[in-house]
Amino acid sequence: MNKPETVTENSLASDVAGPAPRHQTTKVMVGNVAVGGGAPIVVQSMTNTDTADVDSTVAQVAALARAGSEMVRITVDRDEAAAAVPHIREQLDKRGITTPLIGDFHYIGHKLLTEYPACAEALAKYRINPGNVGFKDKRDTQFSTIIELANKYGKPVRIGANWGSLDQELLSKLMDENAASANPRNARAVMREAMVQSALHSAERAQELGMPKDRIILSAKVSAVQDLIAVYQDLAARSDYAIHLGLTEAGMGSKGIVASSAALGILLQQGIGDTIRISLTPEPGGDRTLEVQVAQELLQTMGFRTFVPLVAACPGCGRTTSTTFQELARSIQDFIRDEMPTWKIKYPGVEALNVAVMGCIVNGPGESKHANIGISLPGTGEAPAAPVFVDGKKFRTLRGPTIAADFKALVIDYIDQRYGSGAKAPESVTAAE
């Protein structure tokens, strides 16, 4: 019979679960939002409206901000869009929405920022793609113009290299050097190196033009998960600039969610990333705010931040009663997310609340007891009653067709007692039905 392993101090170290220490980067202020330097990982999103349409863009930015986006990027691709930016900012300010706007520039950013100073002033950050800021002799001049304008207005920049618009001159140079090497690398490795060099060389040039490091954020987006991970690992190892994470062209639906979550989850676990965006192709008529929800859920699931109360729900099986459990779990989750914009102002700390919605007696009561407030529905063949647990103790049993509404009312009462002004922790419940 084998002797049991001796537990040592070294072996106990593996008992500590959690991500690697955050990669140390330089803090950048984007409007009123801190990025990098140990600040909480920031969620950002991007509109898909025509920026020249002020009303629709304001409406979508407002929806994204309400969903929890802490920065919103808008396309600035032509004169009409640049002219609209200050009006968009003005309308958002009138609504009390202070979310920073990021201008996304390609090809003619130097021209638009020069000719529309109100646009340059209204934006909180400029995004520059070094692969299309200009070509051949014009590249350095046009890049310099944008950096000089950013310096003039005191704006940070994100220098974002992208797999689909890579600097072809740099790539050709690296490919030629690789071909002449005694130990050539494969083509994808050379492309990854071109991505990293493009971002780093551009950042160094920006600093030469007078831009301080605390106004530079880097990104290097790829559409393949493993390539993205490798690129960002290399970028982090070679610099301390603040880093924006995102998987480009992730796709729509579950494919896009899974691909982005897989790539970003690995990098975040390794301590890499200061701000993230989940780039999803929206379904026709779909909700643009889904990308914000996924980003928040990724960060919350991994323990980096808390945004909304956590709703634990079992997956359901043959023991659960038809669709009743599924409908209740969805109803409670939607209810909490819909109320959060109000709750986070009225009830500071409410995002740490844990709620359980369970489907039968196997794990239901136990899981509900571990939550702040939980409900365990009757499973198939069980008594038609749903016990509610508050802070680990049975509080009440709900019955009848109004279980969902009754449980929501109990959740609101609990939140008001625990997180309301002058609140104290809810009193222990001594009686149960």
From Swiss-Prot:
Residues 1-23 are annotated as: Disordered. Residues 1-13 have a biased composition (Polar residues). It is an enzyme of class 1 (oxidoreductase). Binds 1 [4Fe-4S] cluster. The keyword Ubl conjugation does not apply. Pfam families: GcpE (PF04551). One of its GO terms (molecular function) is 4-hydroxy-3-methylbut-2-en-1-yl diphosphate synthase activity (ferredoxin). Its cofactor is [4Fe-4S] cluster. Its EC number is 1.17.7.3. Signal peptide: none annotated. Pathway: Isoprenoid biosynthesis; isopentenyl diphosphate biosynthesis via DXP pathway; isopentenyl diphosphate from 1-deoxy-D-xylulose 5-phosphate: step 5/6. The keyword Cell inner membrane does not apply. [4Fe-4S] cluster binds at C314, C317, C360, E367. GO terms for biological process: isopentenyl diphosphate biosynthetic process, methylerythritol 4-phosphate pathway; terpenoid biosynthetic process. InterPro entries: Dihydropteroate_synth-like_sf, IspG_bac, IspG_bac-typ, NO2/SO3_Rdtase_4Fe4S_sf. Coiled coil: none annotated. NCBIfam families: ispG_gcpE, PRK00366.1. Belongs to the IspG family. Converts 2C-methyl-D-erythritol 2,4-cyclodiphosphate (ME-2,4cPP) into 1-hydroxy-2-methyl-2-(E)-butenyl 4-diphosphate. PANTHER family: 4-HYDROXY-3-METHYLBUT-2-EN-1-YL DIPHOSPHATE SYNTHASE (PTHR30454), 4-HYDROXY-3-METHYLBUT-2-EN-1-YL DIPHOSPHATE SYNTHASE (FERREDOXIN), CHLOROPLASTIC (PTHR30454:SF0). This is 4-hydroxy-3-methylbut-2-en-1-yl diphosphate synthase (flavodoxin). It comes from Bradyrhizobium sp. (strain ORS 278). The gene is ispG.
